[in-house]
Amino acid sequence: MSSPEVGKKIIVTVPSTTANLGPGFDCLGAALDLYNEFIFTRIDGGRDRFDLIMESTDGNHLRGGPENLVFRAAQKVWESANIKPFALEARVKLAVPPARGLGSSATAIVAGLIGANAIMNSPLPKEKLLELAIDIEGHPDNVVPSLLGGLCLTARSSSQRWRIIRCDWHDSIKTVVAIPAIRLSTSEARRVMPKNVPISDAVTNMGALTLLLNGLKTGNDELIKEGMFDKLHEPYRWKLIKGGLEVKDAALQAGALGCAISGAGPSILALCKKDKGREVSQAMVKAWENSGVASRAPYLNVQTTGSQFRDISGK
């Protein structure tokens, strides 16, 4: 397959995600309507040339090289499709803050896969892109909803194949995500977790996951309250999030149905009914302020369409 013409341009829009949703450690995640935007352009240059220009919402510009996740994902597409690498520029508008537990790394991986694939007229099917995304990320709960949208449960079957289930999310259940002005890396958050957990904790999580999924499907308040409970990772990670437990308590007192660490943190997800959204948001921001942490708590919707791309060559 020949390289695309110089100047060909693809825009990819990728949603943020909230993963480890309640008891769904490393298997359950949902896409949210906060996006990173990537523009891929075929440029002149040698096959090892990859220009990455990132613009954050605060106007800062950064550059990245071949070690960047976008480039690594693009390489996976070229290898899988037996395509000779070519010079590529990726210009990124960042709205999803990094190291906040909102799947910023997943957006880079998914965008690199989709962009590199689309600019070659999509030789790889979406199923293959999902497989590559999970392989690069190491776990599925961010990249799968980021690519597909909605609430996704992903598990490895007895045949070692990944099985993905799109789960229902009732319209009455809304999300507030409190995003602090502090960072927490996934690697740091994983280091505090034990290698083994009691069987009773695993059983508790399995039961809670069943309750939560049924509650989200039906909009049943009580099932959500009882299901938003975790014993596998949150007990070990709360200590890494300054003021986190106080923020959780404030959200629940303001009427949230449940609260959880978003991804590896430090952002905190609250589930609530629509009429409680403003109160929950204000309570979470105030609680973090009392701990000396600046934050914002936007009211985000579950995004159901996943990542999108289109050809904008000549524009």
Curated annotation (Swiss-Prot):
PROSITE patterns: GHMP_KINASES_ATP (PS00627)
E.C. number(s) listed in UniProt: 2.7.1.39
Record-linked Pfam families: GHMP_kinases_C, GHMP_kinases_N
Gene Ontology annotations for the cellular component aspect, listed alphabetically: cytoplasm
Keywords: Amino-acid biosynthesis, ATP-binding, Cytoplasm, Kinase, Nucleotide-binding, Threonine biosynthesis, Transferase
Enzyme class, UniProt record, top EC level: transferase
Species this protein is from: Prochlorococcus marinus subsp. pastoris (strain CCMP1986 / NIES-2087 / MED4)
GO biological process: threonine biosynthetic process
HAMAP family found in the cross-reference section: Homoser_kinase
Chief location category: cytoplasm
PANTHER family documented for this protein: HOMOSERINE KINASE (PTHR20861:SF1), HOMOSERINE/4-DIPHOSPHOCYTIDYL-2-C-METHYL-D-ERYTHRITOL KINASE (PTHR20861)
Binding site for ATP: P97, P98, A99, R100, G101, L102, G103, S104, S105, A106, T107
Gene: thrB
GO molecular function, one term: homoserine kinase activity
InterPro entries: GHMP_kinase_C_dom (IPR013750), GHMP_kinase_C_sf (IPR036554), GHMP_kinase_N_dom (IPR006204), GHMP_knse_ATP-bd_CS (IPR006203), Homoserine_kinase (IPR000870), Ribosomal_Su5_D2-typ_SF (IPR020568), Ribsml_uS5_D2-typ_fold_subgr (IPR014721)
Pathway noted in the entry: Amino-acid biosynthesis; L-threonine biosynthesis; L-threonine from L-aspartate: step 4/5
Family listed: Belongs to the GHMP kinase family. Homoserine kinase subfamily.
Protein name, entry field: Homoserine kinase
Annotated localization: Cytoplasm
Protein role: Catalyzes the ATP-dependent phosphorylation of L-homoserine to L-homoserine phosphate.
Catalytic reaction equation(s): L-homoserine + ATP = O-phospho-L-homoserine + ADP + H(+)
